[in-house]
Amino acid sequence: MDLLTQVMYIGIAVGIISLLAAFYYAKKVEHYQINIPKVEEITAAIREGAMAFLAAEYKILIVFVIVVAVALGIFISVPTAGAFILGAITSAIAGNAGMRIATKANGRTAIAAKEGGLAKALNVAFSGGAVMGLTVVGLGMFMLSLILLVSRTVGISVNDVTGFGMGASSIALFARVGGGIYTKAADVGADLVGKVEAGIPEDDPRNPATIADNVGDNVGDVAGMGADLFESYVGSIIATITLAFLLPVDDATPYVAAPLLISAFGIISSIIATLTVKTDDGSKVHAKLEMGTRIAGILTIIASFGIIKYLGLDMGIFYAIVAGLVAGLVIAYFTGVYTDTGRRAVNRVSDAAGTGAATAIIEGLAIGMESTVAPLIVIAIAIIISFKTGGLYGISIAAVGMLATTGMVVAVDAYGPVADNAGGIAEMSELPPEVRETTDKLDAVGNSTAAVGKGFAIGSAALTALSLFAAYKEAVDKLTSEALVIDVTDPEVIAGLFIGGMLTFLFSALTMTAVGKAAIEMVEEVRRQFREFPGIMDRTQKPDYKRCVEISTHSSLKQMILPGVLAIIVPVIIGLWSVKALGGLLAGALVTGVLMAIMMANAGGAWDNGKKQIEGGYKGDKKGSDRHKAAVVGDTVGDPFKDTSGPSLNILIKLMSIVSLVLVPLFVKFM
């Protein structure tokens, strides 16, 4: 058995280990019983709404997957079409599994908070997040290794494997856009009518949109985020393997083996790190989660050093891996600087809210723009270091390094919406106030980890898209026997740059408009219920929660189609015209997409935590004050920024890159 075959078997084995670890955490969650009927009723309603959304979304996506697979089979190859279908199915399974456990963990976290305080509640919420994290990387590693093994056995080209990444990317985009529209339509509707107009607290059971709001936390922040990082994870490995086979070396085997082994040991590191996240007295929750992430990173660096030595590769490759990993941690740190409660940036938003909503919005936008500086410098330094030490392959392996700890990052990130849901369930079930106080502490940490997760997703998207772009260039070079030169003085390249730069803004406009349209429907429905059922406010009548869930589901699925199709159609049209123009388009979209994504994510995070800071008594103000009402408006503007448009841009730049890579054989025929 040769080295590469051994590595693929290792990948399959580690993937299975990761899935078994996810199963262990799922059983930990299920160990806690929901013994309060009201909690069980609300948990079941949230689960039913979340799974109904996924079922409706997948019905639409099945048609899309079949159409694209047939086109790939006709114009590229049948194996590419098969890999595309497998990528789509695997991404859907990962999202479905994460959603199922998250909608079990939420009610159990509320019960744990009531019976065991912060320590037990953290245990349940984090276990729910760990299931998502370890499922994402376990499925990714298992399926990718299996496909590579089968392709070697039957003699299929590695280029066909890129279809797997395209399938994962396609599902990820629709999951992010659809989930993002759903969650923010419900959130904006619940906030504007409930908090601002009716003056009732967040998650109050009298608010008709409150169940839809809690369903949205799962479809957007669990399934959507998991699909996003799943796509980055497999995309970075595929890009690196593609580049490895195109390297001018006698034996590409160690270069192909490196990303698989590094990712496999990253999974082991993540599993070990998840075991360290526990607290006996409920103190220092944020510190425990941060420590777990750092442990995963340190273990991965140590393992990577051994792997590079074992494979006999140049140490420059190791330095590129470290550059990627460190860049991920530094970007996460700077995200916290601009979005954490108590930090200067968030204080600026809270202060600005004192003079009204307009000044709060202006300050948030300024913070978002300012927050792009440090992450972009970090990404630029990581790119330069990795290129100097390993060439284009170095940039790709840096992306693999950054994403090696995805299991732990997703676990920490997915814990947030579980904790948020637990607070909502506690409020709606009218559990004792101290239960809500406990879940609020977890949720406050969850907001910070979610912001950090978004920063990580953006940074990893930048490196993954760049590595896919490099693979695209090398693939064109190989098929045309001449170097593809992306010269900025070439009119075709300039045209592509402008179109790519514009796509970011068009895509953001479409997703923001979609949230606005869906939110208007939600606001009108909530107002109608308050108007026609006056007994809701004095609790003598029950709101129609199901109607609000139906509105969010229908609107989000209808509005997600155009942005999703746009991301695939535009690179195809430009690529058929000119491979140089397509190169320019990918470069233009990469630059503007990363900048816009960071700005939107951090502005939204600052508005969100600025509002929460006021709710905690900032400068003597509290819920219902003029300062708080202004901050709620800012947070409402920030909701589609940080949870719909911003995160969707990550996938836009990656999907266009991998579509371009997969379709290179078609494009060169038209040159």
UniProtKB/Swiss-Prot annotation:
Its cofactor is Mg(2+). Mg(2+) 1 binds at residues 187, 191. It catalyses: Na(+)(in) + diphosphate + H2O = Na(+)(out) + 2 phosphate + H(+). Keywords: Calcium, Cell inner membrane, Cell membrane, Ion transport, Magnesium, Membrane, Metal-binding, Potassium, Sodium, Sodium transport, Translocase, Transmembrane, Transmembrane helix, Transport. Ca(2+) binds at residues 608, 635, 639. The record marks 450 as: Determinant of potassium dependence. The record marks 176, 221, 228, 643, 654 as: Important for ion transport. Sodium pump that utilizes the energy of pyrophosphate hydrolysis as the driving force for Na(+) movement across the membrane. This is Putative K(+)-stimulated pyrophosphate-energized sodium pump. It comes from Fusobacterium nucleatum subsp. nucleatum (strain ATCC 25586 / DSM 15643 / BCRC 10681 / CIP 101130 / JCM 8532 / KCTC 2640 / LMG 13131 / VPI 4355). The lineage of its organism: Bacteria, Fusobacteriati, Fusobacteriota, Fusobacteriia, Fusobacteriales.
